[in-house]
């Protein structure tokens, strides 16, 4: 997997670009592998601004069965040196510094929207593909930068219809491909770790990083304290990686007291927090607006949601997932609320079934192959004679 490896009769160059932390790679790396296998005449490179991401990608590619892809670390090194611990190098400066190199590709595939800025930095020839990095309901991802992309992926009809109806993406530039991350998880088959000495039902608490939307600032420490004071449940605290940027919990004042609590496991950004290990092993999902709830619902189970901002959420498509379980409107006895969510799960099962079906189109070929074929079609149009 040498980024400089030659390919005979190359008919195109495709870059899969990663300028954030490792969690975003799982949404497209399997499509890169599938494309390289489908089209050995196409140069497929995975480019990242973080050496940690390059190492992680190499492991994942091996787990997927290897493929003729290149791995390339983007510079400059001095700009990487300005990166805070656990974070990613500044995205816009890195894009500006690498615009000339990236502009040499026919297609640039990215899991996040900041890559649209390449158009500002003079990249005109290369076509841009946005894969998404989640399939949630939050309104933030549905925004004008989508118009900069030549092709946008959707996991299913929900995402596609919302983007098209908002006028952000023409229907012909939107490809419904399913959810390639599921293919990666199935290939990795992470073994559930033994986290707790006592076997109890497991709750995964997964707050979002955005303080304007997430439950952590107002309610998070109190929730951890409540679980530390009971003995009926084990709790995995696995927030979005950007909430604490992968810090050591001992260095976070609001978390240090819970580090040695036998019924609480803290993970602020390890591999198990991004490869669905925790959402697969948990019995109950506790969260706010993270798209990970849909990954959890690959197997339908009880959910409980936290409205710490007292938003009027009913009927708002950005909160559709809050119809999949009870919503806590005022923090009281959170353990009793979990009990109630488990006991009343049957009432929410139809909404979970419908919501999952609208979110993920998993029919036909694997999601990774469908994504690769969509990129291949874009490449073929680019190189069509005349």
What does each model-found stretch correspond to?
Residues 249-294:
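Donor nucleotide-activated moiety binding/catalytic core segment of transferases
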Residues 140, 160, 276, 280, ...:
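Catalytic cores of nucleotide-enabled group-transfer and carboxylate-activating enzymes in metabolic
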Residues 171, 291-359:
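Catalytic binding pocket for nucleotide-activated donors in carbohydrate/polymer assembly enzymes
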């Amino acid at each position: 997997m040498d980024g400089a490896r030659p390919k005979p009769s190359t008919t195109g160059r495709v870059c899969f670009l990663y300028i954030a932390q490792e969690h975003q790679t799982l949404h497209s790396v399997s499509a890169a592998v599938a494309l390289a296998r489908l089209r050995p005449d196409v140069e497929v490179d995975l480019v990242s601004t973080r050496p940690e991401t390059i190492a992680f990608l190499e492991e994942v590619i091996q787990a997927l069965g290897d493929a003729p892809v290149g791995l390339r670390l983007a510079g400059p090194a001095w700009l990487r040196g300005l990166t805070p611990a656990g974070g990613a190098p500044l995205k816009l400066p890195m894009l500006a510094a690498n615009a000339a190199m990236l502009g040499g590709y026919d297609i640039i595939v990215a899991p996040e929207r900041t890559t649209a800025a390449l158009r500002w930095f003079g990249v005109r020839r290369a076509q841009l593909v946005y894969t998404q990095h989640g399939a949630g309901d939050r309104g933030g991802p549905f925004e004008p930068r989508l118009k900069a992309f030549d092709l946008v992926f959707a996991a299913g009809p929900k995402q596609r219809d919302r983007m098209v109806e908002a006028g952000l993406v023409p229907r012909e530039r939107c490809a419904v491909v399913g959810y390639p991350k599921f293919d990666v998880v199935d290939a990795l088959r992470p073994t559930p770790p033994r986290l707790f000495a006592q076997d109890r039902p497991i709750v995964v608490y997964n707050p979002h990083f955005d303080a304007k939307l997430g439950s952590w600032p107002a309610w998070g420490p109190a929730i951890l304290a409540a679980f530390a004071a009971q003995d009926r449940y084990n709790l995995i605290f696995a927030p979005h990686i950007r909430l604490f940027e992968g810090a050591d919990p001992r260095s976070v004042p609001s978390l240090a007291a819970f580090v040695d609590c036998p019924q609480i496991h803290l993970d602020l950004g390890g591999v198990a927090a991004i490869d669905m290990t925790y959402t697969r092993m948990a019995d109950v999902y506790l969260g706010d607006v993270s798209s990970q709830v849909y990954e959890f619902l690959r197997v339908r189970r009880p959910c409980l949601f936290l409205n710490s901002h007292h938003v009027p959420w009913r009927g708002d498509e950005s909160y559709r997932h809050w119809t999949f379980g009870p919503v806590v409107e005022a923090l009281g006895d959170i353990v009793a609320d979990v009990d109630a969510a488990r006991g009343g799960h049957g009432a929410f099962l139809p909404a979970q079934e419908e919501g999952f079906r609208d979110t993920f189109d998993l029919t036909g070929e694997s999601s990774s192959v469908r994504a690769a074929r969509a990129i291949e079609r874009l490449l073929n149009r680019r190189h069509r004679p005349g």
